[in-house]
Each structure stands twice: as C-alpha cells, then as structure tokens.
C-alpha cells in the first residue's frame, strides 16, 4: 500500500524525509473504516444525456439532441425534450420488458443475471410533460449494427443508464490508515467493495466502448484496495519515494 505525507514545497526537505524513512520503521497509528454506499445514477433527462454524451463521445449538445431526435423519429427512443429523470408509476411493466430486451441485446450484459429494482425510477409526481429518456420496445425489431455509430452510441447510452438506474446500490467500506514514520504522518486511503451493484454494469458498459473513458466517480481517490492493517502494526525500513505534483487552482 502507498501512504502519502502532506505536501512539501521544498525538494531537499522531501529528499531528507525519504532518506530518514528508509532507515526507520513505520507504525500504523490509526485505522478508520466507514461503510458507505453510492446510489445508482438517475435516468436521463435531455440535459444529463447531453452532458454524458459529451463526456464519453465528445458530442455537442446540439449533436446529441439531433441524434436523440432521429432515434425518436425511428421510434427507438422516447421523446428527448424532457426535464424529468423518472418514469410514471404505470410504466413498471413496460420498463421491465425493455430491461429484459436490453439484457439480451447488449453484449456487455452477457452472462449477467439481472433483477431490476423498478421502484427507483417510477415517480409520477416528478414527471411533468414527458418522462425520462429510455429506449423503446421497437428495439426488438432492430439490429443495432445497422444503425449509424453515433445513433447507436446514444441509444446504447440511454439503455445502459436504464440498467444502472434500476440496479442495486454500490456498497463499500472506506478505509483510512495513518502511519507515523521519521516524525511525519502519512495517510493511505482505499476501499473494500462489499457489493458491486450498479457499478458492475457501469464497468461492463465502459469496457465495451471504443475509447475507454475514465470513471468520473467522486470517490475515485479511494478506489485502491488496501491490504489488511491493524493499529500498532510496524513496518521496518519502508520503501519511500518523492513525487512531484502541479498544484491546480480552485474551481470558480
């Protein structure tokens, strides 16, 4: 496991600390474990579809709207000009049928036993004029390979989001370990996945894309899995290294 000290602005000071650590012992001073969950993402409204299509494929907002409109006119996607991220309460059976269809159509769902939690996406009170953007049952009559790649990207993106939105929560244990070495504190962060939930579908979907985008998880700094530690555990002559990082200004 890697543990980092606080930032040091002086390179020579960092080099001295590195040398001191390598002839010292590191002690696990504290170990904090916290069970956390990450809820599935919501279904797409137009704005969130445009944002995600830009992140994954580089499409502009207008390109995404035009592609979604073309799919709507082919009856493969529901009405795209919506500000709702939910389906109406009476759409449970429809959504279940579409999800079953998607599991058979999408190669990245092969071998995945999936039972949707439909209650997460049904809420008539949060639907005004039009419900969230999802594929339609017309997809059953369509070979995805015959669609233009850009349209296929949008349709698959909307379908993958329906699967993720109805999947189980992602449950993990966040671990923060603090070590003392050569008079300096070092911190290591990691996670232990308890139940993968919707993130397994997210990984499967991203792995199937031509260009593999990085996850945009807010908890990406805790993605590493740490080996088991106990408080008071010691490590003789730990390996140390100095790394340089550019500071980034705060976002406005």
Describe the predicted segments one by one.
Residues 1-252:
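Core catalytic DNA strand-manipulation module of type IA topoisomerases
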């Amino acid at each position: 496991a890697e543990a980092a000290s606080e930032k040091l602005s002086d390179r020579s000071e960092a080099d001295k600390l590195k040398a001191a650590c390598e002839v010292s012992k590191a002690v696990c001073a504290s170990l904090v474990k916290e069970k956390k969950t990450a809820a599935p993402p919501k279904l797409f409204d137009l704005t969130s579809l445009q944002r995600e299509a830009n992140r994954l494929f580089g499409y502009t907002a207008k390109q995404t709207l035009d592609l979604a409109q073309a799919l709507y006119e082919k009856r493969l996607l529901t009405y795209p000009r919506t500000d709702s991220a939910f389906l109406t309460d009476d759409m449970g059976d429809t959504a279940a049928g579409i999800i079953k269809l998607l599991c058979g159509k999408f190669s990245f769902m092969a071998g995945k036993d999936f039972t949707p939690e439909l209650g997460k996406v049904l809420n008539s009170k949060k639907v005004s004029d039009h419900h969230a953007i999802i594929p339609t049952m017309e997809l059953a009559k369509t070979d995805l390979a015959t669609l233009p790649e850009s349209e296929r990207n949008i349709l698959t993106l909307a379908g993958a989001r329906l699967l993720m939105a109805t999947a189980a929560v992602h449950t993990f244990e966040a671990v923060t370990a603090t070590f003392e070495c050569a008079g300096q504190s070092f911190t290591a962060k990691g996670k232990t996945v308890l139940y993968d939930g919707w993130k397994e579908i997210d990984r499967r979907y991203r792995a199937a894309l031509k260009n593999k985008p990085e996850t945009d998880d807010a908890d990406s700094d805790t993605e590493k899995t740490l080996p088991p530690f106990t408080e008071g555990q010691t490590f003789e002559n730990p390996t140390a290294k100095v790394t340089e990082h550019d500071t980034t200004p705060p976002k406005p």
